Every structure is written in C-alpha cells, then in structure tokens.
Amino acid sequence: MEQGVIERARELRRRIENADHRYYDLADPEITDAQYDQLFRELQELEQKYPELVTADSPSMRVGGAVRKSFVKVRHSIPMLSLANAFDEVEVKNFVDRIFRRMGSSNPLEFSVEPKFDGLAISLRYELGKFVQGVTRGDGDVGEDVSENIRTIRSVPLKLKGNNVPAILEVRGEVYMPRDGFSEFNKRAMARGEKLLANPRNGAAGSLRQLDSRISAQRPLSFFAYGVGLIQVEQDLFEEIPQSIASTHSAMLAQLRAWGFPVSSLVEVVQGSDGLLAYYQRIGEARDGLPFDIDGVVYKLDDLAGQREMGFVSRAPRWALAHKFPAQEQSTTVEAIEIQIGRTGAATPVARLKPVHVAGVIVTNATLHNADQIARLDVRVGDTVIVRRAGDVIPEVAAVVADQRPPATQSWQMPTQCPVCGSEIVREEGQAVWRCSGELTCPAQRKEAFRHFVSRRAMDVDGLGEKFIEVLVDSGVVQGVADLYLLTVDQLLQLRMISTAESPHAFLREAREHLASGAYAQLEATLVGIGVDLAGEREVPQTWQADLLRAGLPTFDWNRKKIATKWAENLIEAIETSRDTTLERFLFALGIEHVGESTAKALSAWFGDLDLIRHLPWPLFKRVPDIGGEVARSLGHFFDQPGNQKAIDHLLARKVRIGDTHPPSPKLRGELRLANLLEDLEIPKVTPIRAAQIATAFGSIDALRNGGPEPLVEAGVPQSVAESLATWLLVPANDTLAVNAQKKLSALLAMMPEAGEEKTGPLDGQTVVITGTLAALTRDAAKQRLEALGAKVAGSVSKKTAFLVAGEEAGSKLDKAQSLGVEIWDEARLLAFLGEHGQQR
C-alpha cells in the first residue's frame, strides 16, 4: 500500500475529528455538512478498499456494526454514585452550612455548578488516549457494555487530544438526545408510520440499549462530560483526579475540555448559598429555551481537597447536591375527554384529569391536540397517562401507561355535534383539525366572526376595531352579527364608559355628569344589586362590568361638553352604510371555511342570488370554475346548519340589502347535466366516463334509485362500479342528497336565461396579472375594474396569462412574463383601455 494512501487516511481522520470537536464541543463549525459528508465518504471508501487502514478510533466506526445478542455486564472500577436531592432553598442552605462547619473555613465556599442533564449516565474508558469501552451506570456497581453504540455518537471523542493524556482515564458524563433531534426523529417516524419516542430521555436510553449499533447510529445522540473515575498517570492509579492535573473541579472540567470532551458552557463557579440559589433561578428561567432537557442543577464543592475531606455518606458524596426542578412529567388518570371550540372553530380534545402537581402547578386539564393524536396514543377515559408541562406550555398528554389500563374501556370517538352550539363538527379529507360548522352562531367563534364580518373587504364597517369588538361580545350586547344593526349611539357611549372604568366608583363619578338624580340613584341600586359594595368594604366582583350591562342601565342624558360622541355617531353611520352591499361581499362576510374573496366573487357571478346559493346542494357548487370538492363541501356544511341559516335570516330582517341580485349565468346551462352531477356526487368508482355512460342509459337519478346493480350491469356498466353505485344509494343521506341535487339542477335550468341574453366583457375568460406600483389608482381598484370587464386577475404569471400590467418597480413577475412571451401593458395603456370601456376613474 502506498504511503500516500496511509497519509491521506490519517489526514481525513484528523479533519473529521477536528470537525466533530468544533461542531459538538465549540459550537463553531468551520466546514459545511456537505463538506463533512464528502470527507466521511472518502474515508469510508479508502477503508473499504484497504481494510488494513481501519483502526478502532476511526470516525468510520461511528456508523455501527454487527448485531449483538445481549449486553455484557461490567463492574465499575469506581462505583458511579448517586447524589442527594434538594427540592427547596432550606435544604440548599443546610447543605452549604454542613460543609462550612465541617471545613471550618473562614473564606466563602466556592462551588462548581452545572445543569443536571436529563439523559443516561455513562462511563467512558480510554487507554493510551483511545476509547476502549463505554458502560452504562446500571445500579452504580455494575452496568452494561454499550461500547459499539457509544462509538456512533459523534460528540464522544474516539481519540484524545494533547500530550498529557493519562494512560488510563475514565470519564463520567451524560448521553442525551437534543430537543431538535428528538422532534425531527419523531417527524420522520410518524411519516413512516413507526413508533414515536415518548421523550428525549427515553429516546437516549433506548438508543444506547439497541443491540444493533446501526440503529443507534441513526439516533441523534450527544454527550456532556462532568466528572472522572479511575485515572492512571504513569504507573500510579488514582480514584480521583490527581493534584498534578487539577486542584479544583472546575479546573478538571477545563482539562476534560482540552482533551476533547464536550463540557457544558453553562458550568460556572459561584460562592455560598446565595450564589447557588441565584444560579438555580437563572437556569430555571432559561430552561425552556435550552437545546436539551434538564431536570435541575448540580452543586459540587469546587475544591478537590475539600471534597476528599467531606467524604461520602450512604453511597452519596457529602460535597455534592442535586437541586431538582419541580417535575415536568407526572402520571395521573383521565376522568373525561371533552371538546373545546377555539375562536376559529377548531375542535380540540381536552383530557380532564385527576389533579396532579406538574412543574410546580396543579394540572387538571391537558390538551390532546387533535383526534389523530388521540388515535395514535389510544387515550381512553380511565387510562393512566403521562402528563407533560414545560414552562408556559399548555400541559399535554404525552403517553398512555398501557399496562395500567382498566378493563372494558372504549376507544374515544370525536362527537358529531359542537358542544357549544350544536352545529355539525366536520373534518375535510386530509386535514388533522375538526371544526364546528356553526361559524356565524357558535358563541366560541363569535369574536372572530365579528372581526371578519366588519372587515374592509367584507361589510366594511369603518371604525369598529378589534378591541371594541371584544367589548361588544364580552358584554353580551351582541349575540350574533345581525345585532350590529340594532346598536345605538347611547349603547356605544355606555359601553365605552363602562369598559374603560377602573372601578364601579370611577364609573359612577363619570356617569353622574350624564344622569338626572333619580337615574343616578337607580344606577347605584343596580350596582348594589349585582354585588358591588359601594362602601368599599368588600372586594369588587371581577365581572361587575358584564353583570351591570346584563342588569340594564338607566337612560343617559349625555352632556356633550363632558363627553365625545362623534366617534359613536360615525360608527353608527358606518353600520348603516354597510346595510347596502353586494352578494360577493355578503358571502365573503359570512366567514365560510375555504370561501375567500375570489370564491365569493365566482359564486356571485355564476348563481347571482343569495336565496339560490343558500339552498343549493353542495355537489352543484362544483360546476363553478375553480370550486373543487373541499370548497363545495364546506359550503354545504355551512348552509346545512340551522343556526347559520337563522343568522342570515336575521341579517335580512335587519334590512341588510344585496343590490346586485341577478339570474344564474347562462354558462351554467352546459354544465348542468346528469353526467356531471353523477361525477360531482363523488360516488366511489364512478369516473367521468362511467358517469356519462350511466346518464345516457338511465336519464335521471330516480331511474337509478331502486333497481340495484342488475340494471346497471345490463346497461354495460362493470359489476364493481354497479355495486358501488347501488351501495352508495342505499345510504339514506346519499339518496336524499342525490334526489335534492337532481331537483335543484332542474329548477336551475328552468330559471336560467338563454345563452344569448348574457352580457360579456371585452376581457371575458382572460387571465390578467398586475405587478409593481400604479400611480393613478390602487392595485385593488385596478383589479375591480378589470374584473368588471370579465377578466380573472391572478397572482402569478403563467402561459395562460393574457397580459401583464407592469407598474413602477415591477419585479420577478415582469421577468417571467417576458421570458414566456406574455404581452406587457404599462399603466397608460391600462388607463386608456379602461376609459374606452366605461371604467374611468
């Protein structure tokens, strides 16, 4: 073998080891992941070609090797002892006092402090600077040999740095799984349908105990060193770090770092109990932002001679203490599983728990995230579960203790109705989240419904901001969006006065200016009636504002010199103005899931009438271009809810007027065929070709309903398709849907004008894109005028784009249009074209 090959292999090992050191120990990588992979592959190829190059400390050994049948038990040369625990400040102060009294020192005691890593304790043995063995802590006396798995951890050095390396060195530390590595591993496992890791600690322990080290090599493990065991320097064996190497624990950690071991950057040296407790506080506050899990901090007397003097008791050192954080995981029992409805309608399952202390608080509820998560965990009422809480994160059910499950438990099923409003709970195919379909009426969604309803692109109620919407809803003054049209100036002024008052007394002082004496006395009596002690001897109820509004207020005679009323008058005027609207805006304002402005515009253009749209079976919506099954079903779910229909009735009763009602577009005529309906019903196995075949043979839904599969087969329909259709029609809900859709299709055809009656615009059917800044009009105004001429205004350029309107500072869209040969219009040409066709500014 050539000397150059040997030198190249040596150089590759050196560079890879240095890269590992800079990445894991210094957090300062100097090469990219791709460059690292290239070096690693080159070394592997050399060692495969020349097996005699392979050494025990080669980085290539980290990929794992042969499968073991079992782990060998190994007795520790020096026992791996446990630490005494402290859970409060008194125990920490007692710990310091005991050392102080025993040492008899007049100087402040110094301690080396570090996080208590939540992983698996390990002992690493090096001989002549090379890694030879890794052993788990086990029971402290005997552990298991996991050397092959340890070799796969890139942050564990296989060969030590420096010239003063002991002949034998045992290093104690913690193998852990970083949080981001844990998350990524579980994402990949979920995608492959594999079992998820319960938490990073279990992930680290399970990874090290894999009999196949190739599996360990795929796990994102890392390592921190925090102590030493047996050391041999020259011919002398030491059971602790010798004075010649270090005289303090912190100096020993610095030496370990110099030899190439990763040591936490959070290690510090502090003085006395105040220093210990301040460190505990700092680490506790930083805990949730750390890249790894910890469950406390560890205090060690820094002076090694002092450690020797303090000694041990009951297999624990007197000179060290673990100050534990309150547990972030505990087990408890699921007493019920209920549904919470969020402001956007998302239905989140929540476990009601037997109360348990987790991370310093009593937890009685924990999120289960969604129905899929419940199915993955198989959480059932009565189960014993592991509850996790980290910092301010909402407590969650992390795992089920399956072997403690009581008999006769049942799998949980998502309810079919919203627990708040009774509307149907639905989930679109492929979505994780179930939603309440009572968008307009569900109290849980009320604020979001109002915010959307009054927004600029919906009903455009100018001056009604988010904070005042909260006041309106929280006060109970408005129960549904139609209640906006019942508001008065008096109500708005009273609401603001109450909502901004710091106390009932402050409200009374301000209200006095606007009330006659009799009305003022009535207001005082009302406050007393809702539990407010005007003498100030009892605590004011937190809900006094809402309670007062519900109880009713006397008539105010507003002193306009003392209060501004113009804002309220303007808001009422804006509400009145919004009564006159378009069908497009009204549909968008309803807040139907998946129905944005463009879909609302298409529905308005193609159907033209609210009464028609709100009673249309969902498959017929699919005849509108760009409306697919998901949007169509969402429309159907919305209009199927009695509460939503009642909310629309209330809006119309409050004189909300749609001014652009028109007959359905004649373009629908060619779409309203039985073949299309059969396709749009989404019947399994009924393809467009089969739908056309069935429509030709039978002519109506009624002809298909009662014959079963035989007539279909006789008409040439394949047996499997015939059986699928017949089975589908046997479901009452499907049968009703098909019949209603057929009836509505016929009614639509009857009310539709002939094709020649429809007016078309000069841009009918053309797609236009606008980019850059226009000087004479806004992008929205340009879009509206182009759409009025029949154009579809899109957000991206494609081969189907008819032309691009390019304003100032046009960017990548202009470049793409030019590359595709799309016609380019400047603003002057656009304005001229709009003027020619009656769309002047």
Curated annotation (Swiss-Prot):
It catalyses: NAD(+) + (deoxyribonucleotide)n-3'-hydroxyl + 5'-phospho-(deoxyribonucleotide)m = (deoxyribonucleotide)n+m + AMP + beta-nicotinamide D-nucleotide. NAD(+) binds at residues 33-37, 82-83, 114, 137, 174, 300, 324. It comes from the Bacteria. It holds the Pfam family DNA_ligase_OB. Zn(2+) binds at residues 418, 421, 436, 442. Its EC number is 6.5.1.2. One of its GO terms (biological process) is DNA replication. Keywords: DNA damage, DNA repair, DNA replication, Ligase, Magnesium, Manganese, Metal-binding, NAD, Zinc. Residues 758-841 form the BRCT domain. GO terms for molecular function: DNA ligase (NAD+) activity; metal ion binding. The active site is at residue 116. Belongs to the NAD-dependent DNA ligase family. LigA subfamily. DNA ligase that catalyzes the formation of phosphodiester linkages between 5'-phosphoryl and 3'-hydroxyl groups in double-stranded DNA using NAD as a coenzyme and as the energy source for the reaction. It is essential for DNA replication and repair of damaged DNA. This is DNA ligase.
